[in-house]
């Protein structure tokens, strides 16, 4: 949701997918929700592992939503391993925390060129996370939904920066997938 209109003061002023989720949680549960979005743009899951205590575990949260992968660009086994290490690092400090894993939304397929090769293995990440699913770990499969959308819409219709950031439309879809996965 890094390129939602609300971040730039543009109409219609839509919040990020995380803010949409937060508002839905409060509305659905009719009680205050303590929501910490400690994400940092442009980082990868190695950074998340290194910073897991201060960014997540020290809050002793009931739920952690992990959405890494866009900047990892590694193979699916390495991605699954890093995500598993991140879960373990958080559980060392906060053993009762549950997790919702989101494989990254997909970047522009045309971004597989020098110098960045931005499109790499991201389309494998949803499948790779299934090996971590189980007690206390669920998956919100935004990639399956985005792939279906891609059959009818051009990438420019769902991106805010033509490379990898969701626009208002895809951010709403992402929020809806997470909300549905959480059973709200």
Task: Give the label of every model feature segment.
Residues 93-99:
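A short helix->loop->beta-strand "cap" motif at the edges of active sites that frequently abuts
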Residues 78-86, 118-125:
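Charged helix-capping and loop-helix junction motifs
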Residues 34-36, 98, 136-138:
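Conserved beta-strand segments of alpha/beta enzyme cores
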Residues 8-13, 75-79, 112-117:
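Short, solvent-exposed loop/turn segments at secondary-structure boundaries
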Residues 5, 45-81, 107-108:
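Oxyanion-hole/transition-state-stabilizing segment in secreted/luminal serine hydrolases
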Residues 105-184:
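Catalytic His-Asp segment of secreted/periplasmic serine-dependent ester chemistry enzymes
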